[in-house]
């Protein structure tokens, strides 16, 4: 009788253990997005496991009783700094030998207070990631908790240290040849190949929604996207990944490491490298409303360092939605449009390229063709010679002639009554008012009202003239073959006003001139000549600009090259981050 009671008691205890779900605690830094916690909690629940997650900010620690009742603690620490932060927050809580745990990221993986075979299996599931592995992790925990064997489950599926990804492929590819063979039926044979550098963690975390949409948009632009992850520690990672691929441009989508090695590889590849960022402090509406599109705490890592490695034109392309990165359509299209323009610039023969060059008038003065410590006329003459030698169709003009031309052009802004004579002499260009109004009326209502409130109705602008029965903006500009030479228009109606003002909207004529450069003249690239102009100082976010901000509306997707004095690092940052420029 006593033996029967003992058996029943043991059976009851076993059944109770089975009835109570295994308890998993997931602890990470706040670098790990909440969407991962939510997704893992859902998969755990489907396996009969309860997961409670906690994301720690710097200096935070889990509540004293948070670990109580946990059967397994998972430490998710992607970077060494995350690992140090989480381990410091835990203190000596793991030293007692009673809390089973695994740790992945920020260094070699590890586990404690678990049988070696089980600990290695759980680490393998979590470290390699992906939905199949992570679901098996929770099934393994459920079985272990219930006293059932775990080794009958499939072993962890390894995720290679390098590979190629596409959302429509059945699985990632270990090498480029297999990926290109798979994509041969998707892309035109001459589709430009664009490398997208993605984090391995996005694949492991099954957090690829924003990447998936970007790759599909890239294909709609006629591009062949090569989404690759690689081992940062390998100094030849990109060379090995893209050997024989004829990659035309690179787009960085991750927190890139090993900068010196990547810089050397970028130089060897000799293609444009564009930087992208994600906004982690809210959704798209929050980002649009923010004065800074990139938080100060991330500016050094995601703006400053990448610039020193050769990346340019940083664009914020995603924000958080329900804890997951979500692509912002307008920003993504701005990135892809810029890629299209860069690809066109690379493919066009030099003789067919049209370049626009803007020079400055600061400090103001009708005869002042100036830039900081730059002899502008002499430099223009030398640039013209170099362009002709490279095959560009640029008319010959010596320094003296360039001085005369540039000063006459400036006179059109100081004495608007001379515009008619300049136009007759071929020293002015024009844009139909209707073309400007078509562009202007497509602006958001708040921008239109802001400009009207400050500058009035564009139909009454002083630069309008009747030409062949049509109202047109007229402004100084000289054609030197396929090079358009023009003074940058006054950003606030009159020369010298509001040069660094980041609150006053630009004048209608200012935007009309840039529209002409983009659409009327059809420039393939724009040269902002010397230190410095005003476009990069227009109102908008201080960094991480939206395509709706004035600086980007003026430029559109034009590639910009900006010879800049080397000792003015601070203002050159504005040219790169707000002027979409490659500084020279």
Predicted stretch roles:
Residues 14-17:
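N-terminal signal peptide c-region/cleavage motif recognized by signal peptidases
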Residues 1-8:
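Bacterial N-terminal signal peptides that target proteins for export
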């Amino acid at each position: 009788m006593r033996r029967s009671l003992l058996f029943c008691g043991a059976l009851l205890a076993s059944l109770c253990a089975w009835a109570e779900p295994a308890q998993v605690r997931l602890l990470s830094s706040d670098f790990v997005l909440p969407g991962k916690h939510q997704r893992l909690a859902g998969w755990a629940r489907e396996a009969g496991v309860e997961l409670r997650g906690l994301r720690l900010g710097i200096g935070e620690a889990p509540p004293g009783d948070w670990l109580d009742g946990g059967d397994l603690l998972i430490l998710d620490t992607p970077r060494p700094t995350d690992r140090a932060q989480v381990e410091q927050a835990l203190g000596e809580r793991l030293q007692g030998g009673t809390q089973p745990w695994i740790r992945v990221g920020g260094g070699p993986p590890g586990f404690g207070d678990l049988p070696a075979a089980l600990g290695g299996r759980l680490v393998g599931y979590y470290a390699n990631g992906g939905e199949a592995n992570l679901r098996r992790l929770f099934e393994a925990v459920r079985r272990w908790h219930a006293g059932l064997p775990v080794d009958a489950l499939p072993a962890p599926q390894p995720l290679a240290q390098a590979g190629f990804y596409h959302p429509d492929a059945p699985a990632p590819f270990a090498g480029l040849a297999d990926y290109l063979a798979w994509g041969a039926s998707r892309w035109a044979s001459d589709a430009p190949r664009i490398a997208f550098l993605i984090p391995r963690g996005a694949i492991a975390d099954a957090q690829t929604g924003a990447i998936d949409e970007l790759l599909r948009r890239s294909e709609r632009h006629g591009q062949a996207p090569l989404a690759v992850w690689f081992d940062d520690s390998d100094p030849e990672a990109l060379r090995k990944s893209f050997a024989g691929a004829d990659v035309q441009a690179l787009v960085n989508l991750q927190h890139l490491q090993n900068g010196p090695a990547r810089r050397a590889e970028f130089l060897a590849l000799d293609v444009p490298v564009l930087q992208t960022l994600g906004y982690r402090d809210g959704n798209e509406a929050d980002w649009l409303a923010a004065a800074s599109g990139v938080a100060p705490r991330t500016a050094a890592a995601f703006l400053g360092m990448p610039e020193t490695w050769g990346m340019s034109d940083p664009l914020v392309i995603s924000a958080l939605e329900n804890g997951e990165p979500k692509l912002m359509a307008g920003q993504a299209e701005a990135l892809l449009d810029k890629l299209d323009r860069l690809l066109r610039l690379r493919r066009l023969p030099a003789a067919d390229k049209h370049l626009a060059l803007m020079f400055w008038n600061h400090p103001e003065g009708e005869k002042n063709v100036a830039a900081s410590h730059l002899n502008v006329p002499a430099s223009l003459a030398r640039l013209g010679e170099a362009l002709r030698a490279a095959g560009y169709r640029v008319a010959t003009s010596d320094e003296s002639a360039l001085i005369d031309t540039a000063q006459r052009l400036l006179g059109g802004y100081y004495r608007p009554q001379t515009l008619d004579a300049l136009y007759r002499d071929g020293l002015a260009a024009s844009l139909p008012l209707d073309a400007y109004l078509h562009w202007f009326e497509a602006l958001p209502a708040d921008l239109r009202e802001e400009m009207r409130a400050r500058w009035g109705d564009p139909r009454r602008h002083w630069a309008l003239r009747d030409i062949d029965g049509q109202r047109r903006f007229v402004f100084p500009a000289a054609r030197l073959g396929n090079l358009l030479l023009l003074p940058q228009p006054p950003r606030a109606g009159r020369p010298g006003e509001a040069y660094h003002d980041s609150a006053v909207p630009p004048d209608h004529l200012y935007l009309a001139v840039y529209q002409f450069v983009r659409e009327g003249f059809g420039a393939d690239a724009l040269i902002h000549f010397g230190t410095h102009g005003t476009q990069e100082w227009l109102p908008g976010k201080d960094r991480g600009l939206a395509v709706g901000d004035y600086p980007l509306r003026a430029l559109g997707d034009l590639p910009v090259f900006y010879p800049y004095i080397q000792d003015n690092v601070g203002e050159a940052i504005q040219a790169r981050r707000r002027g979409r420029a490659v500084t020279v």
